[in-house]
Every structure is written in C-alpha cells, then in structure tokens.
Design a protein with these regions (language model features):
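Long, low-complexity intrinsically disordered regions
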Residues: 1-173, 179-180, 187, 194-198, ...
C-alpha cells in the first residue's frame, strides 16, 4: 500500500531512537484497507514489518503489541544464514510439512489450512505431497468411511501403531476456535460430521449459537459445544449455554470426563467457582 510505504522510514527511525512502540505511539491520520476492516497506517506498517522479519513483538500491554527492531533481539548470524530452501519446490515441501505437522494429519484438498503459502496451487501441492510420500517424509493413510486419503509425518509412525491399543476411558477436551485442528472447517465437517463457525464477527441477531463458543471433543467425536463467560472480578466461570450435538448418547463416562475438563479449564482461567 502507498500509505504504508509513506510511513515505514519514520517508524524505523522512531523505534531506533525511542525503543519498543505500538501503533498508538504514531500520529498518522491515514487509514488503509486491512484484512477485516480499515486500519491505521501505523498498525498496518508495524504488522507488515513484523511479518517480513524486520520487527519483533517486544511485549504486550493488554491486547496492544509493542514492536522493536528484530536486530536487537536476534543474533546477526541468524540473519546472515542462507535460506535452506533453494528452490520453490523445496520451500513448498517444507511449508506443507509444517502445516500437516501443525494439524497432526490432513488431506490434500484445497482449503483454508493451505492459505498463505506463496506460489502454492492445487497442482503443485498434489505433486509435492506425492513426492513426500515417495521419499518417506509423509505417510498416506486411509480412514474407514472417509472418502479421501490423509497424510501425517513419518515421525508419527510409532504413535499410529500405539493408537490401536486400548488406553482406557476417553478424555474430553475443549477446543479453542483458532486451534490448528479447526483451521479447515470443510475437513472437520467431512471427517467428524461437525460443522463449526466462529461467530465473533457476526451481529448478535445473525448468530446461531453465541459470541465465543468452544467445541467439545470426547474421545474421537465432537459431542457438544458451549459458550463460556468468565467474570474476572468475581472469578466465576459461567457456562452461559450448552448444546449437545444431534444423536449424541450422553454416558456417565462422558459426563465425568467433561466435568474434569471443565475444572481444568476453570483452573486455567483462574476461576474460583463454576456457575451453570
């Protein structure tokens, strides 16, 4: 953006002289188109400089990020190292491996989890994954009742072998809306028959469930979703709403696992009481 380019040099100079700064420390009037909504040129410039490696996040004050020059915190020899990926193909294999490792296992179909990998399209992704399977870097798996192959890192082979063994009663987990597992909603819907939308950015009247709703995983199934509200002053975790998924048979093991998970969640938040 032209407006971002106009402020880059001033931002560099100010951070060099004054140390870590946030977007609020710059008096630029202009706004730029930026992802979900227009943003101040200072914020867009700081985020851009962070993404290309010129700045680091030094600290936060609440939700506000303070940026500093990367060279003050990262040794120069790291900056001087050559890119290990000398070809586009090598870069794509490296980035595909990172994405699959981040999720655990994943398919090769187009979707949100593949966004942001420079130059990668469907044909290149397919070719890269096939080569990674041939070389032994990835393992191709078939899931009973699932129409598409999925892939995981070869380092997970032992874990896959152990997954056939009985491990006792299933456990419950609350999944954060931006958890890697939920990156690709189409994948989750196809694999688990679980449809999830993060409704934070929807108007209240347009929401099906709630503002901040967490999926509940029990064993290998998504069995519910709920809306937690944490009262920081009273240190109370309020379970505002709870929705069981259609067809779920609620058992004592399931309820006990969810109770334990809720206690753990409350402890993580610092809640002293749970209210339903």
């Amino acid at each position: 953006s032209e407006h971002i380019d106009e402020v880059l040099e001033q931002i560099r100079k100010d951070i060099e002289v004054r140390g870590p700064l946030s977007s609020q420390d710059f008096d630029f009037d202009k706004k730029v188109g930026w992802y979900w909504a227009p943003a101040k040129a200072s914020r867009a410039a700081l985020e851009s400089m962070y993404w290309w490696g010129e700045l680091v996040v030094h600290h936060r004050a609440g939700t506000r990020k303070y940026y500093d020059l990367a060279g003050r915190h990262i040794p120069q020899d790291i900056f001087d190292r050559l890119d290990p990926n000398t070809t586009e193909e090598a870069y794509h294999r490296w980035h595909i491996s990172r994405r699959i490792d981040s999720i655990g296992l994943f398919w090769s179909r187009s979707g949100d989890a593949w966004l942001g990998i420079k130059g990668l399209n469907s044909a290149k992704r397919t070719a890269a994954i096939e080569e990674m399977v041939r070389s032994g870097e990835l393992i191709e798996l078939e899931i009973e009742g699932f129409d598409y192959p999925v892939y995981t890192s070869s380092v997970n082979r032992e874990l896959l072998d152990r997954s056939h063994e009985s491990t006792g009663a299933p456990e419950a987990s609350f999944i954060a809306p931006l958890d890697n597992l939920l990156w690709d909603r189409k994948f989750i819907k196809s694999l688990f028959q679980f449809e999830y939308t993060w409704e934070v950015y929807k108007r209240p009247q347009d929401r099906k469930y709630g503002y901040y709703v967490l999926p509940v995983l029990f064993g290998r199934e998504f069995v519910a979703r709920f809306e937690p509200v944490f009262d920081k002053k009273k240190r109370v975790l309020n379970i505002k709403n709870w929705w069981w998924e259609e067809g779920v048979v609620v058992t004592e093991d399931m309820k006990e696992a969810i109770r334990k998970c809720t206690d753990d969640f409350a402890g993580f938040l610092g809640a002293e009481k749970i209210a339903t």
